[in-house]
Amino acid sequence: MIRYSGFSVVRSCLSRTFSRNNSALSTAITSSLLTNLFPTCKSCGVRLQSSDPKGPGYYILEESKPAKRFVKSEDQVFAKYVNDLSLEDKKLLINEDSKKVSDSESRSESQDLSNEADIDSSLVNSLGNKDYYASEIKKVSQKDKFKLEEKYNDSVECVRCRDATYRSNFKNFSQQEYPLELLDNIMSRIPPHEQIVYIVNAQDFPMSINPKIFQYRSSNELKFIVNKADLLFKSINLSKNYGQTFFSDYLFHKYRVPKENVMVVSGTNYWDFDKVLDFVDDNSYLIGNVNCGKSTIIKGMLYTIDKSNKRKKFMSSRERTKMEKEQDMLINRASRMKAMTAGEKKKEKKRYEMLFRSKVGPGVSHIPGFTRGFIQIDLEDMDKTIYDVPGFVNSENQLIHHHDIYNKISSPKILKQIHKGVKVYDKGTYTSKYITAKGGQSLTIGGLFFLNFPQKSMYQLRNCINHDFHLFSNFSRAVYISSNLSKYPGMGSKFFIEHDDSSLKELRRFIIPPFHGSIDLVIQNLGHINIKPTGRKETNQPLILYLPPGVEAIIRLPITNYIAKTFTGRDAKGNPLRKENILTKGVLALQRYTAKYPFYSTLISANKGAEVSSELALILKSEATCEPVTDAEQERLVKQDFARIGEWATIARGVECNYNERTVVDERNKFDYWME
């Protein structure tokens, strides 16, 4: 249950004050007291106020709320045209003459409807398929709804959260309304020595792990929950067997985190949440990057407790006897009501779950910065208190430019779609569908980034980001269309960001480090694209990635190698196989992470130096002067990239390295150009 009274926190904080003499602790205690002594928004944790409509935390007092309910714009238009119809046309529209319902049945149905839960349309708007969920939620009994309202009667939300969650209204996506912070700022507000549970996003692993956390807590003190496992695994058993093995291996070998301090879960599917309740200690602070699913996990914990209580109540002999008597009475009276089948019980359970998630716990949104303050949640039945903490970003670049990116995205629906992710076990394995990118082509996903492939090359691409990508014949074509979408109406669905000269000039140029075999190109918070070279290699020219400010990316070894059994390239006796025999004679095995080689690499920045050129600069110059890009300019750009890769490898290996067309990259040296 979410608490707004801070007296229990006052007592605990005062006891710590007398036992410790620490300035950082005092600062954290003061922050905790101020947070809990005043009423806060149950969704985002910001301090509530009713005086300034434009200020953070504004909410409408109960007595000042207008009686008129919110009506969607579509319904307003529909009502306008219906009111203009004649009575006969209205009857024809609703097909009144064909109804064959008796007066008694109509009265019975009306009585049934009057007992259904009266759910706000604003609540329904937050649940995806609105028509479906509206009908499903309204079927939840009034009794269940009343119990929720009675138990969780402190659900006060600010106007911003109501608009964002229930009406998809993000008009003021700014630092004031959706604040982003760095890890240092978050940790400065948490009392020292309190338990930290770090939530990790499996969707872009390991980008959501900030190594700076180990400056505040030792690896033995930290606990990690890897969330969104349902995107990687088809079932909870696979998550337990393969996911738990890989993620605990990685955190142990990389950061010396004890394997018993790691859990792999799905917040939306409640995988292993009975164990999560025991795993999370009293007075734990749940931290993590934006959009990692902290609030979803807390909702899952609350729902699991509620479900456990209902199960215990249902198993009571008195309640069972009462239920059996009621069923006997219904049968004897030949009532229209029938005992629920297994399918109906499952539907009823799902309806209650949807109602519970919409009413109880902190707010959940795909918008970064939605949680604005520390939210205290009392798990009364577990005798525990936990804290939902605002998400953070890992770099100043994201802190400054993150809001700009989200303001450019054309629709809130697109935001929700791309953050939802895809099932990697369907889209990202060796048996999944792929497309082929050929030399010179340029790939984009909605105009968010551009990935350019070198001439004389060929790659298989498997998309694990929840938006279709589009291949252009060349980068020049991609740039022109992305900045002139009005001339190409058929391309509108391919882009959710429209560029202009200003936004194009802001794009940052990165070199993909040389690699051998397949890799994943990971875009933070969105997912990855699996890239596999195919055919004969004829050039050492690298792949080039253009990213806008505020968007981060890395490359990594294919994660499917570690979370599913894959071909080893050897037969049953351990002998290496030729490429054409791998699928027919090769054996499958689960690869274990040992930290012997890098698992991922950051990208090589190609923007350093005032004299550095780029394809984009040459294209924009060509468009301005109406002169084509010359071969000499292209060759100079390739040499520039080779030199930059050599500098990068020199730093990574500690010895001077050169990189050119004669350099051989194979199994023996494929990690020489990777730097974590």
UniProtKB/Swiss-Prot annotation:
Residue ranges, compositional bias (Basic and acidic residues): 98-110
GO function terms (MF aspect): GTP binding
Q: Which domain of life is it from?
A: Eukaryota
Region Disordered: start-end pairs: 98-117
Q: What is its main location?
A: mitochondrion
* Entry keyword Glycosyltransferase: no
As listed in the record, the transit peptide stretches over 1-48
- InterPro entries reported in the protein's UniProt record: G_CP_dom, Mito_lipid_metab_GTPase, P-loop_NTPase
- Family, per entry: Belongs to the TRAFAC class YlqF/YawG GTPase family. GEP3 subfamily.
Give the protein name, as stated in the record: Genetic interactor of prohibitins 3, mitochondrial
Task: Tell me the lineage of the source organism.
Answer: Eukaryota, Fungi, Dikarya, Ascomycota, Saccharomycotina
